[in-house]
From Swiss-Prot:
Keywords: Carbohydrate metabolism, Glycogen biosynthesis, Glycogen metabolism, Glycosyltransferase, Transferase. GO terms for molecular function: 1,4-alpha-glucan branching enzyme activity; cation binding; hydrolase activity, hydrolyzing O-glycosyl compounds. Residues 1-17 have a biased composition (Basic and acidic residues). PANTHER family: 1,4-ALPHA-GLUCAN-BRANCHING ENZYME. Monomer. HAMAP family: GlgB (MF_00685). The active site is at D342 (nucleophile), E395 (proton donor). It comes from the Bacteria. This is 1,4-alpha-glucan branching enzyme GlgB 2. CDD domains: AmyAc_Glg_BE (cd11322), E_set_GBE_prok_N (cd02855). Belongs to the glycosyl hydrolase 13 family. GlgB subfamily.
Length: 664
């Protein structure tokens, strides 16, 4: 099952059966004599797995050496016997004068070439340890790559950029988000909007996205991966160029323009990031030097059969330096405010996606990947120390303990974790006919049993509206009116539930078709159909309501910020609860009715004697509802007790609707 160690000169090649085959050949990997300039470079931290800015010296950099302007190429390929730099400048031929020098025994190769200009395409021709096979690889540290289907790296400088977001960054560093509003709009840049059916540039996107986010009232955007990737249908999650801003939408400064404009308009930017696995395309990281390099040496551990990818070797120092540096690259160079770390479960578990007999336990006999655990702890420690307020979010789908617990307390150290349990439970509930919902009431209240075990974000992400899962609006039960009413009550229940929020693009105006990465959202329906326009207005109003009421976010992760009124009314499929703000006077009462019945004189407990008024109602006519609203009426609490409350009121509750009340 496991791979064998490499000794002397052996070509290591993965086989489908999980073993490793060896072919002994002549060792051609001896170090050459290096110049004084080369010897001045220190790779100690990189080789120890402690380098956080490897992109500043690995890859291709325009420099002056011995009074000559040119490019220094540097790469890591420990088992290569020879490496050539090939490209436009030498007709892609393997010539000795373009042969890189091995400058240490750990596999650092380097070469200075004069008179090269920006825009030149290049690759590394890597000869394996035996000298009998050559692979043509893109530069793992390249800042730019060709647009697919072409695969070469492109010589690019990190040009100066005039940032205007200092005020935003200072605020980010000083203030955390736990007690602040966080309402995230997740989007895929290639399909949010298009121009004449083609990709828009980062600059063009900035002209429309910023105004839309401001109009709708979201606090953050989350971009699906924007590093270079060969396959559009992978959405960026199967990457090759970890340091290359995808050429689909432009260049590095184009992306900086987009982020800068978002920040100047007080909109945060999160980025999906994938340190778990990478694609197996021939020009990429896979078998980089003809043998396992960035991936695990043991094939069972390296091969991710479910996704057709390879898992990073998270225990290898040079791979750790590659990934730590990449995380800081996005934070330092592009000012992103946080990384949403993809597929954390795949990293944590040795048996993730594997059957019995397909994996080996760790040294303690368990299924935890000890190297990945250590990697994630170190990653989060680095970002906390050097990221100046940048956050990390874990996409983790199991009950692994301590995801958001501090590293000092033996947690993994993430700031937030997606609440996949809440998402799965509630989405399965809303698809049910209301007749049967009372038998599944626990799907809507169970999340509060573990809500304070982690710092959760409630996600309705891209994964839930593709591959036959149906769009969010189409998951709802009933005819069109009931579907839109169901969407409104569900969204307002989500907004009232403790935890930060995330909603995928298109859900906010009720797009019926599933998300398609090859075309833009169906924006035309907003103009053509009144219900889509009203649904958009509903989400706009709901987002504004969220922002304006600190009780909905100031105590998300404190138990005193939430109190059930009635968690167990399964017979009527109603959930009622109170959200409480920091000063304890800020209180909102939520009554969420998941049936199509109007409940007249519905009794609900209230925290104090006094007068109550309507703060929000999902059934308002302007949102496409039936108009079952309290309006300007005043509801007077009585001393009639209800559940754990000494006082109560009676009110009309709208069908498939949420009524929110507050003290006058």
């Amino acid at each position: 099952m496991g791979g064998k160690e490499m000794r002397n000169c052996k070509e290591l090649k993965h086989e489908k059966n999980g073993n490793v085959t060896e072919k002994v050949g002549k060792n051609k990997g001896k170090s050459k004599k290096v110049s004084k300039d080369e010897s001045l470079l220190s790779f100690d931290l990189f080789l120890e797995g402690k380098e956080h800015s490897a992109y500043k010296f690995m890859g291709a950099h325009f420099i002056t050496e011995n009074r000559k302007r040119g490019v220094r190429f540097t790469t890591w390929a420990p088992r290569a016997s020879k490496i050539y730099v090939i490209g436009d400048f030498n007709n892609w031929e393997l010539k000795e004068e373009y042969s890189m020098k091995k400058i240490n025994e750990r596999g650092i190769w380097s070469l200075f070439l004069p008179k090269l200009e920006e825009g030149i395409k290049y690759k590394f021709a890597v000869v394996n340890e035996c000298g009998n096979n050559t692979v043509y690889k893109a530069d793992p540290y390249a800042f730019k790559s060709e647009l697919r289907p072409n695969t070469a790296s492109v010589l690019t400088k990190i040009k100066s950029f005039r940032w205007g977001d200092k005020r935003w960054l200072n605020k980010r560093e000083k203030e955390g988000l736990d007690n602040k509003p966080m309402n995230i709009y997740e989007l895929h840049l290639g399909s949010w909007k298009r121009k004449d059916g083609e990709f828009m540039t980062y600059e063009e996107i900035s002209e429309v996205l910023v105004e839309y986010i401001k109009e709708m009232g979201y606090t953050h955007v989350e971009f699906m991966p924007i590093n270079e990737h060969p396959l559009d249908a992978s959405w960026g999650y199967q990457g090759v160029g970890y340091y290359s801003v995808t050429s689909r939408y432009g260049d590095l400064n184009g992306l900086k323009t987009l982020i800068n404009k978002l920040h100047k308009n007080n909109i945060g930017v999160l980025l999906d990031w994938v340190p778990s696995h990478f694609c197996k395309d021939e020009h990429g990281l896979f078998m980089f030097d003809g043998s396992p390099t960035y991936e695990y040496e043991a094939w069972w551990k390296a091969n991710n059969e479910g996704w057709g990818t390879c898992n990073f070797d998270l225990g290898r120092p040079e791979v750790k330096s590659f990934l730590f540096s990449n995380a800081m690259y996005w934070i330092n160079e592009f000012h992103v405010d946080g990384l949403r770390v993809d597929a954390v479960s795949n990293m944590l578990y040795l048996d993730y996606g594997r059957e019995y007999g397909e994996w080996e336990p760790n040294i303690y006999g368990g299924n935890g990947n000890l190297e990945a655990i250590a990697f994630l702890k170190e990653l989060n420690t680095i970002i906390k120390k050097e990221g100046k307020g940048a956050i990390t979010v874990a996409e983790e789908s199991t009950s692994w303990e301590g995801i958001t617990k501090p590293v000092e307390e033996d947690g993994l150290g993430f700031d937030y974790k997606w609440n996949m349990g809440w998402m799965n439970d509630t989405l399965s509930y809303i698809e049910l006919d209301p007749i049967y919902r009372k038998y599944h009431h626990n799907k809507m209240n169970f999340s509060m049993m573990y809500n304070y075990s982690e710092k959760f974000i409630l996600p309705i992400s891209h994964d839930e509206v593709v591959h036959g899962k149906k769009s969010l609006i189409n998951k709802m039960w009933g005819d069109d009116w009931k579907k839109y009413a169901g969407l409104r009550v569900y969204a307002s229940f989500m907004m009232g539930h403790p935890g930060k929020k995330l909603m995928f693009m298109g859900c906010e105006f009720g797009q019926f078709v599933e998300w398609r990465e090859w075309e833009e959202l169906q924006w035309n329906v907003i103009e053509e159909f009144d219900i889509h326009r009203k649904t958009k207005e509903y989400f706009k109003a709901l987002n504004k309501f969220y922002l304006e009421n600190s009780s909905l976010w100031s105590l998300d992760y404190e138990e005193e910020g939430f109190k059930w009124i009635d968690a167990d009314n399964s017979e009527e499929s109603v959930l009622s609860f109170i959200r409480i703000g920091k000063n304890k006077k800020e209180k909102l009462i939520f009554i969420c009715n998941f049936t199509p019945e109007v409940y007249y004189d519905f009794k609900v407990g209230v925290p104090e004697l006094g007068e109550y008024v309507e703060a929000f109602n999902s059934d308002a006519l302007e949102f496409g509802g039936a108009g079952n609203i309290v309006g300007d009426s005043i509801l007077k609490a009585t001393e009639e007790s209800f559940k754990d409350f000494d006082y109560s009121i009676s009110v009309k509750v709208p069908p498939l609707g949420t009524l929110v009340l507050k003290v006058k």
